[in-house]
Amino acid sequence: MKSFLVIGLGRFGASVAQELSALGQEVLALDIDAENVQYISDQVTQAIQGDAQDEAVLRSVGARNFD
């Protein structure tokens, strides 16, 4: 199993996150919009609200550790 970080949960990002999760992959989804995070939270391994343009946020989720 691989681990994926999906940044941005608009139509495309949410679809990617859902498909990866359905394929049995570990998915951390990140978006600045709380509604997008809430929508996807029960469909992925973890969903976090945060600004992906903030390096501290990316470090805190361990962005370098994903496939």
Residue spans of the language-model regions?
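Cytosolic regulatory regions of ion transport systems
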Residues: M1-D67
